[in-house]
Amino acid sequence: MRSGFALAILLFCALETAPVVAEPKTELSLIAEHPVEGMRGGNLSGLALCGDELWAVSDRDDDQIYLLDTRTATWQAQALNIDVPPVPESGLPWGLRSRTKAASFVRGGDLDFEGITCDAVGNRYIVSEAHAAVLQVPMAGAPQWLKIAPGMVREARASGLLLHFNALFEGVAINPEGNQIWLTAERERRGLVSIKRPQSLWDCDGPCVLLSEAGIEMQPGQMPKAKAISRNFSDVALFKGKLFTLESSQYQLCRRDAVTAAVERCWSFAADMLAPQRQYDQPYGLAEALVIDDGGAWIGLDNNFGPRADGEKRPMVYRFAAPAGGWGAQP
């Protein structure tokens, strides 16, 4: 009996870790690429479309966010200084927080801003990976941290999320009304978390964790020295009631149900982003920022100051056309 139970556990673990070879996906078409000048810390880690303005954050800059001037092919980042108040306690354990603090002295950026989003009136919301917290930067008034119930982090960790250094919250999306937020946990395990604000406190409405999954998957064939690596989420966007997850390890984005997080359809951007002249001598996908609109997708790269094959070192934003039939198209 014991040997049978042990065999079952081994089989389950094998299923969890066996590399998956993805089915072919429709390729998105690249229509423009824009280097970004003026980001002090480089490392573009989040994008948001607020009305007709594109905003960006860097995971190296704690005291400013960026409005992007997109009138020319080379975009100019215009800094908006922000006075960030002390970060509230989120429930992350001391070990994770201390490692993050130590890393900030080396790389800069104690807050580690990894995503930005906007509600319908233009308030901006920025997720701090280091602290599992969300900062609101209103159109008028001082920035403030959202009051999030500690049960959110407890539930996420109980589901296997937020357990590893530098693998915490990596993306954020908010509904137009400004009362529901979705957060992506990056990897090992990756997941989607949702919280709502009935009054002043953001809390779970039912389960916080919509998705928690492990597993590894082969990188696309265009990747030099492609290998099996952990599935990940590097950003999330909300468009017409659907979630779109940026999955940089596999160079894809996927449409998901906003309630269940179930996958509905995925598209690849590997063919154009991994064209020889656009490749980086880095072993992982660098896409970290996503905006979806009717016309297509904006995808931003955090290149860690590393050059592309053609020598370009600045942060990049790529524009991909929407797929045939639009983002709501069925397979």
Name each model feature, range by range:
Residues 1-6:
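Bacterial N-terminal signal peptides that target proteins for export
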Residues 20-331:
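Sequence/structural signature of beta-propeller domains
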